[in-house]
């Protein structure tokens, strides 16, 4: 089942974030993998999707400087955690800093993973991102 929707939540003083119960259903074994994402966000995956993702990252190749850099950046800033009894996950201070996450967080479902965005960073990203029609046109041209 795809992860969908947008939710606003608040990061507490201990760096914990409540994940909506509807989204937590995708994390049946409770293992949560958190990593630096693209475009200024933090990615959250269940174990099955994490294994698929790390396989893709590894396939970028260790033979090139770019492949090694991508692997190092993603893997060195990743963390494995679990949900606490209140449905919260802990976001490391390293990831909070890299993604400029302060207090107000936007949680979006992005098909196979969640993305965590600082509210202000998300608003700037959405404002600057291509409109859906433009993105669809560019997508069609690449097919």
UniProtKB/Swiss-Prot annotation:
Name one process (GO BP) from the record. Answer: negative regulation of DNA-templated transcription initiation
Which segments constitute the SpoVT-AbrB domain? Answer: 6-49, 78-121
Q: Which gene encodes it?
A: mraZ
Cite the Gene3D superfamilies for this sequence: Transcriptional regulator MraZ domain
User: Which organism is this entry from?
Assistant: Spiroplasma kunkelii
One GO term in the molecular function aspect is: DNA-binding transcription factor activity
InterPro entries, per database record: MraZ, MraZ_C, MraZ_dom, MraZ_N, MraZ_sf, SpoVT-AbrB_dom, SpoVT-AbrB_sf
Q: Which family does it belong to?
A: Belongs to the MraZ family.
Q: How does it assemble?
A: Forms oligomers.
Domain of life (superkingdom): Bacteria
What is the official name of this protein in its record?
Answer: Transcriptional regulator MraZ
């Amino acid at each position: 089942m795809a992860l969908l929707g947008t939710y606003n939540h608040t990061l507490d003083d201990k760096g914990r974030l409540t994940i909506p119960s509807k989204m937590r259903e995708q994390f049946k074994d409770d293992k949560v993998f958190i990593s630096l994402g693209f475009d200024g966000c933090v990615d959250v995956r269940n174990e099955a999707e994490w294994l698929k993702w790390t396989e893709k990252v590894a396939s970028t190749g260790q033979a090139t400087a770019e492949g090694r850099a991508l692997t190092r950046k993603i893997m060195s800033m990743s963390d494995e955690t679990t949900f606490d009894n209140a449905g919260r996950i802990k976001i490391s201070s390293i990831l909070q800093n890299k993604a400029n996450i302060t207090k107000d967080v936007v949680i979006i479902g992005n098909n196979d993973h969640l993305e965590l965005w600082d509210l202000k960073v998300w608003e700037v990203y959405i404002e600057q991102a291509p409109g859906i029609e433009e993105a669809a046109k560019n997508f069609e041209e690449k097919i």
